Curated annotation (Swiss-Prot):
GO cellular component: cytoplasm; DNA-directed RNA polymerase complex
UniProt family annotation: Belongs to the RNA polymerase alpha chain family.
Superkingdom in the source lineage: Bacteria
Gene3D superfamilies found in the cross-reference section: 5' to 3' exonuclease, C-terminal subdomain (1.10.150.20), DNA-directed RNA polymerase, insert domain (2.170.120.12), RNA polymerase, RBP11-like subunit (3.30.1360.10)
GO-annotated molecular function: DNA binding; DNA-directed RNA polymerase activity; protein dimerization activity
Annotated spans, Alpha C-terminal domain (alpha-CTD): 249-337
Enzyme class per UniProt: transferase
Primary gene name: rpoA
Name of the protein this chain belongs to: DNA-directed RNA polymerase subunit alpha
Catalytic activity: RNA(n) + a ribonucleoside 5'-triphosphate = RNA(n+1) + diphosphate
Keyword field: DNA-directed RNA polymerase, Nucleotidyltransferase, Transcription, Transferase
InterPro entries linked to this entry: DNA-dir_RNA_pol_insert, DNA-dir_RNA_pol_RpoA/D/Rpb3, DNA-dir_RpoA, RBP11-like, RNAP_asu_C, RNApol_insert_sf
Length: 337
C-alpha cells in the first residue's frame, strides 16, 4: 500500500536532450510529469546546477612589477582592475585537484588572450580567444595564475591567504561550469489527461561539461541529499517466475540462416525466397529449393552439408512451426544453439 505513494506517480516516458550543435548550450525536455512536479524539479535542478557543480577557476594572479590591483602598467591599455576582471572570465577545465600554476608572457604590440597562457598537462583553456589585456609597442607583461577547483562562487576576499606574498592579487572565482539556467513549465497530454507538466530546461555552460552531463550530475546530487530522509527499506518484490514452455522442436531451428557459413550466392537465394530461420529451411524439399531462382545444384549440396553437420536435413516436418512468438523465442534460446 505505502509503495503506491511513489510507484503510481507518473514518470517521464522520455527525456530529450537537444544540443543545438554546441557543447555550451543545451535544452532538456522531460514529459509527462505529475502536476506541480515540473516546478518542483525545475527549481531544484536549477539551484543545484548553478551552485553545486564543481569546476576550475583562477583564484589569484601575480603580475611582474605590480604590487596591488589599483596599479597601472606602462604600455598596457587596461589598468590592473580591468585585467583582473578579464582574468575572472577565463573558462578552465582541469583534471584532478589543484592548486596548479599557469604563466603567460608576451611583448607588444598586440592583444594578450587566454590562448597565450602556458598551461600544464591537465589544464585546458576553453575560451582561448578571450582577451585579457592589450599591449602597446614596446610593452611587456608577465603574469602567473593560480588555478584551483571548487564549487559555486568564491569572492576574492576568501581567496586571500594570510601568508600570501606581496603582489599576489586574489581573484573572484566562478567555479561553476554552468553559466545560466532557465526553465519553463507547459501542459502536456498523456492519454486522456491534458494537464500533466512538461519541463523544459535551457542550460548554458562554459564548455567544461555538457548540458546533458550537468543535469545528470545535478540530479545525482539531489538523489544523494534526499536519500537521508528515507527512513525505511522497501520490501523486496519477488520477480515472477516466467513459465517457459517446453519447445516442441529443436531450439537450433530458431537460428537464422544468415548465421550459417554459406556462400554469398546461397545466402542471397535464401533471402530472396524469404527463408529466415533454419526451421523455415528444413521444411523445404530438394525439388522446391531447386525451383528457387539462381539456386543450383552446387548451392543445394552446400546447404545439405551444413544441415547434416547439425543433424538436420531438407524435407523435415515440424508441426508446431512457425511459433507465434518466434522472435522472442529466438532471443531466449540463442545460447542453446
Amino acid at each position: 500500500m505505502i509503495q503506491k505513494n511513489w510507484q503510481e506517480l507518473i514518470k517521464p516516458n522520455k527525456v530529450d536532450f537537444i544540443t543545438h550543435g554546441s557543447r555550451t548550450h543545451a535544452t532538456v525536455v522531460a514529459e509527462p510529469l505529475e502536476r506541480g512536479f515540473g516546478l518542483t524539479l525545475g527549481n531544484a535542478l536549477r539551484r543545484v546546477l548553478l551552485s553545486s557543480l564543481r569546476g576550475a577557476a583562477v583564484t589569484a594572479v601575480q603580475i611582474d612589477g605590480v604590487l596591488h590591483e589599483f596599479s597601472s602598467i606602462p604600455g598596457v591599455r587596461e589598468d590592473v582592475t580591468d585585467i583582473v576582471l578579464n582574468i575572472k572570465e577565463i573558462a578552465i577545465r582541469m583534471e584532478g585537484e589543484g592548486p596548479k600554476r599557469m604563466v603567460v608572457r608576451k611583448e607588444g604590440p598586440g592583444v594578450v588572450t587566454a590562448g597565450d597562457i602556458q598551461t600544464v598537462g591537465d589544464v585546458e583553456i576553453l575560451n582561448p580567444e578571450h582577451v585579457i589585456c592589450t599591449l602597446d609597442e614596446g610593452a611587456e607583461i608577465r603574469m602567473e595564475f593560480t588555478v584551483n577547483t571548487g564549487k559555486g562562487y568564491v569572492p576574492a576576499d576568501r581567496n586571500r591567504a594570510e601568508d600570501a606574498p606581496i603582489g599576489l592579487i586574489p581573484v573572484d572565482s566562478l567555479y561553476s561550469p554552468v553559466r545560466k539556467v532557465s526553465y519553463k513549465i507547459e501542459n502536456t497530454r498523456e492519454g486522456q489527461v491534458l494537464d500533466y507538466d512538461k519541463l523544459t530546461l535551457n542550460i548554458e555552460t562554459n564548455g567544461s561539461v555538457t548540458g546533458e552531463d550537468a543535469v545528470a550530475y545535478a540530479a545525482r546530487i539531489l538523489q544523494d541529499q534526499l536519500s537521508i530522509f528515507v527512513n525505511f527499506e522497501e520490501p523486496q518484490k519477488e520477480a515472477p517466475q516466467e513459465q517457459v514452455a517446453e519447445l516442441a522442436f529443436n531450439p537450433a531451428l530458431l537460428k537464422k540462416v544468415d548465421e550459417l557459413e554459406l556462400s554469398v550466392r546461397s545466402a542471397n537465394c535464401l533471402k530472396n525466397d524469404n527463408i529466415v530461420y533454419i526451421g523455415d529451411l528444413i521444411q523445404k524439399t530438394e525439388a522446391e529449393m531447386l525451383r528457387t531462382p539462381n539456386f543450383g545444384r552446387k548451392s543445394l549440396n552446400e546447404i545439405k552439408e551444413v544441415l547434416a553437420s547439425m543433424g538436420l536435413h531438407l524435407g523435415m516436418e515440424i508441426p508446431a512451426w512457425p511459433p507465434e512468438n518466434i522472435e522472442d523465442l529466438a532471443k531466449r534460446y540463442e545460447d542453446q544453439y
